């Protein structure tokens, strides 16, 4: 199909019978070749992918149209080609040729690094704006999602507020034990309620006899509540540990490290030699500073381990990274 475009009529308007006869014979032979199903499928597949790749080519390539169609360079990879548009729309790419697969892999990997570079520059600009506005409190950036808490009325789970979960859990357990062991028996004695079903057991384990007045319903409620809260706390701790394992060990999930050139200050002190004239003592001038060129004044540089993602072992083969999760 691409040779039909190349073997078009000449640019001048003089149609010579000789050239017209050659073009007619060549097109007839080419049409006869299309009778085989295998050749037609191959050419149609090549034309489909070439038509998609032609949308992303520059306008400068129009001057050399004939050699650009014949050649198949890697810079003609489709810019709008998307294999996975969402969890429900996944295109069938099993029929693609080897060259097309390699070109699309190269193109998509380049797009990934371009997007990561955009995120890096946006974060640098964000830090610069915060420094210009005088925002001294620097919150730690965390790209990993927060796990919702199983305990009601508590904030999302993270490693920073894990102590709050411990305090809440122990407070609830202590309150339930005090209610079931001391408060409930006292109220039952004053109200004339309760029973002696646990009296023998309390006496055998040498506990205060006041505990024998506990109602079975209260005891069941207290024991069940303590077990449920303990199980929820175990789940919360496991979620925190899983979240910490997914973070990068070097940048702790922030995606950036402190700049070693400016010592995380964002500015460099210019050291100038001091010269004296006639042995006179003159006061030294104040040192001058300039913006660090390594970190652009932000005090942070990209983490080379996670490539600004904040995730440990950021790789396209990492089984923990699930785009549909």
Swiss-Prot record:
Keyword Plastid assigned: yes
UniProt entry tagged with the keyword rRNA-binding: no
Cellular component aspect of the GO annotation: chloroplast; chloroplast membrane
Superkingdom per UniProt: Eukaryota
Low complexity: bias regions: 53-71
Residues in CXXCXGXG motif repeats: 248-255, 292-299
Residue segments, region Disordered: 53-77
One GO process term, biological-process aspect: positive regulation of carotenoid biosynthetic process
Keyword set, alphabetical order: Chloroplast, Membrane, Plastid, Repeat, Transit peptide, Transmembrane, Transmembrane helix
Main function: Triggers accumulation of carotenoids, mainly beta-carotene, in fruit flesh.
Protein family per UniProt: Belongs to the orange-like family.
Name under which the protein is recorded: Protein ORANGE-ORANGE, chloroplastic
Name of encoding gene: OR
């Amino acid at each position: 199909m691409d040779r039909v475009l190349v073997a078009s009529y000449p640019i001048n308007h003089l149609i010579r019978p000789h050239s017209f006869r050659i073009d007619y014979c060549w097109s007839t032979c080419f049409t006869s070749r299309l009778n085989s199903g295998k050749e037609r499928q191959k050419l149609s597949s090549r034309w489909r992918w070439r038509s998609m790749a032609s949308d992303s080519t520059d306008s400068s390539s129009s001057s050399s149209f004939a050699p650009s169609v014949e050649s198949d360079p890697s810079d003609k990879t489709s810019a709008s080609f998307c294999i996975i548009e969402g969890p429900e729309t996944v295109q069938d790419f099993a029929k693609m040729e080897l060259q097309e697969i390699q070109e699309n892999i190269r193109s998509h990997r380049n797009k990934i690094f371009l997007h990561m570079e955009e995120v890096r520059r946006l974060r640098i600009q964000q830090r610069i704006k915060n420094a210009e506005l005088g925002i001294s409190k620097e919150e730690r950036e965390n790209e990993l999602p927060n796990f919702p808490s199983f305990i009601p009325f508590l904030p999302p789970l993270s490693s920073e507020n894990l102590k709050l979960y411990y305090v809440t859990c122990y407070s609830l357990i202590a309150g339930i034990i005090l209610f079931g062991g001391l408060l409930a028996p006292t109220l039952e004695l004053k109200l004339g309620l309760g029973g002696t079903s646990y009296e023998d057991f309390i006496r055998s384990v040498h506990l205060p006899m006041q505990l024998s007045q506990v109602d079975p319903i209260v005891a069941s409620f207290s024991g069940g509540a303590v077990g449920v809260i303990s199980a929820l706390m175990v789940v919360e701790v496991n979620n925190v540990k899983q979240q910490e394992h997914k973070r990068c060990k070097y940048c702790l999930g922030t995606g950036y490290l402190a700049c070693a050139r400016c010592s995380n200050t964002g500015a460099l002190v210019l050291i100038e030699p001091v010269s004296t004239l006639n042995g006179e003592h003159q006061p030294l001038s104040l040192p001058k500073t300039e913006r660090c060129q390594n970190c652009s004044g932000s005090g942070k540089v990209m983490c080379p381990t996670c490539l600004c993602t904040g995730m440990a072992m950021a790789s396209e083969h990492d089984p923990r990274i699930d785009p549909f999760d």
